Structure formats: C-alpha cells, structure tokens
C-alpha cells in the first residue's frame, strides 16, 4: 500500500485507510436494543472510526430508547465523523451504508439523524438475527 503524507509529514488516520482521496463508502452499524442505541461507523476494511451510544449523548435510562434519542445519536455520530474528516487532512467519505440490528421503530430515526448531518445514505440493510426454529424459548411467566 502506498502511503500518502500530509503537509506536516504525518499520515492521517483516514488516508491510511484509503479514504482520503477516493471518497469511499463507510459502513454504519446500528444496534438497537430495548434499553440503549449503539451506532458505530467503520471504514471499508472494518476499522472503527466513530462510536457513540445514546447514553454517551447524555440520555438517562428510560430516555435512551426514544425516537428523539435515536435521532440525536445519529446526528452526534455524523457530526463527529465530519469533524474527523475536517481535521484528518481533508479526507472525504463518499456515502454511508447502514446495517441495522434490532427494534424497527427506532431505525428510521437514526437514519434521519445521519442524513441531517449531511451524509448520503447509499443503502439500508437489516441484519437482525432471526431464529429458524432453533432453541426452544423459555416457558411463559405466570403472574
């Protein structure tokens, strides 16, 4: 791999990943659980660039699973990536491919937050694990 150097002689983190001049597509992994939201942006080779949760965006326990928290988390991740691109020697991310796992009601809010940060969404994929009649579920709770 040929190294690209910045003016100061240092190699930027994004240029090492091959994203400086090409404007490649970054991958966004959104994990939506019942109690929290985790959004991770990775380079095409899998290196983590930015990671944020609803808890790190100052949402308390019950607020973390709301649509507002999902949109704010998506916006926070997008603005952090923009800041990384600006300080990383003019690196450009061409677009985002979103992989979601979990609750469907919060999915649109996270994508809306990423889009409002100014990124082009190139694809949305659902990777929620679905059992094909695997393990037997626990018996129902009696109250």
Sequence positions of predicted segments:
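Ribosome-associated RNA-binding proteins
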Residues: 1-143
């Amino acid at each position: 791999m040929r190294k690209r150097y910045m003016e100061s002689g240092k190699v930027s983190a994004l240029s090492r990943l091959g994203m400086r001049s090409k404007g490649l597509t970054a991958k966004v992994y959104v994990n939506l659980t019942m109690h929290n939201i985790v959004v991770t942006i990775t380079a095409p080779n899998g290196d983590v660039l930015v990671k944020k949760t609803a808890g790190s965006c100052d949402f308390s326990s019950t607020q973390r699973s709301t649509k507002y928290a999902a949109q704010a988390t998506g916006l926070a991740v997008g603005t952090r990536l923009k800041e990384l691109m600006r300080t990383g020697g003019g690196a450009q991310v061409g677009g985002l491919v979103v992989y979601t796992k979990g609750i469907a009601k919060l999915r649109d809010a996270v994508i809306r937050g990423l889009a409002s940060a100014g990124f082009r969404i190139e694809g949305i994929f659902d990777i929620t694990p679905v059992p094909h009649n695997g393990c037997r579920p626990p018996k129902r709770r009696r109250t």
